[in-house]
């Protein structure tokens, strides 16, 4: 009589064990310090990569894709995001990292309150409109949002996902010689025709910017993201690396407080405050993803 309940318990334990083993940690890491267009300010986003990889390897990530400098074209970044979506399974853990320039682009979809899209800058994106790039080489927040939501749909509500953006979407014309700023002050005036629509109603591919994950950003929207000098690395990347290596455990508020404290201690005269956002920031901990 007791054998049947015992068999049920053993079967349940085996099922739970298999479910846990099926959970896969996957990452996409993008870092740019070089660009096809020489007009971009020299930065060191590529030097963030080793620090990120050390964190991920320590956390036993099984699938890690890196795109560095000339590898990180718009087409390759999009392909990597789509491939990540296709490989993901329910309950997976996903880490996405972007270190590079950011730029504001005049919003072609009219979905932004200020008519400006925040863009990641792939290797083949140009700082100003030209024959090589009329805006199609920039990766807008609208596009990124679609890819990220597709990934979220694949991993399901119990999957965990974080996006780390060590960039800045506004620059500073007063940049000094001893500071390296990720971002530029000029707005890219996109040619709307390349998007294939002329009004918001015609654009069925632009989704509302739901954020069903945790996002760590290097600074607030009105601030600049200044790199560290020693070591030469992104400030948010190095803050996250340092605190994870120090095993700063606890909930997200505790870890983020440590990250902000580190950035503040390594910031000069201009303030830089990292931002934690996303619907999931109170649902699970960053340490669940990186430890």
Residue ranges and their predicted role:
Residues 18-291:
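Cysteine endopeptidase catalytic domains of the caspase/legumain-like
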Residues 1-8:
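Bacterial N-terminal signal peptides that target proteins for export
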Residues 8-17:
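Bacterial N-terminal signal peptides
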């Amino acid at each position: 009589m007791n054998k049947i309940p015992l068999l049920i318990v053993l079967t349940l334990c085996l099922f739970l064990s298999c479910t846990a083993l099926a959970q896969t940690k996957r990452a996409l890491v993008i870092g740019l310090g070089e660009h096809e267009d020489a007009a971009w300010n020299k930065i060191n986003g590529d030097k963030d990569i080793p620090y990120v990889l050390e964190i991920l390897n320590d956390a036993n990530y099984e699938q890690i894709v890196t795109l560095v400098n000339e590898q990180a074209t718009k087409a390759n970044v999009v392909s990597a995001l789509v491939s990540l979506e296709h490989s993901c399974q329910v309950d997976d853990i996903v880490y996405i990292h972007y270190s590079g320039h950011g730029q504001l682009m005049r919003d072609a979809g009219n979905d932004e309150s200020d008519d400006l899209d925040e863009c990641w800058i792939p290797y083949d994106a140009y700082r100003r409109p030209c024959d090589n790039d009329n805006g199609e080489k920039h990766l807008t927040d609208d596009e990124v949002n679609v890819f990220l939501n597709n990934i979220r749909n694949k991993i399901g509500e119990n999957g965990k996902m974080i996006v780390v953006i060590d960039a800045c979407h506004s620059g500073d014309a007063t940049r000094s010689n001893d500071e390296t700023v990720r971002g530029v002050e000029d707005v890219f005036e996109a040619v709307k025709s390349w998007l294939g629509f002329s009004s918001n109603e015609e654009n069925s591919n632009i989704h509302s910017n739901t954020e069903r994950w945790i996002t760590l950003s290097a600074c607030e929207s009105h601030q600049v993201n200044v790199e560290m000098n020693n070591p030469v690395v992104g400030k948010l990347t190095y803050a996250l690396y340092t605190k994870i290596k120090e095993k700063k455990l606890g909930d997200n508020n505790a870890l983020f407080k440590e990250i902000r404290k580190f950035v503040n201690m390594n910031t000069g005269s201009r303030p830089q405050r990292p931002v934690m956002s996303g619907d999931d920031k109170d649902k699970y901990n960053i340490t669940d993803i990186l430890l």
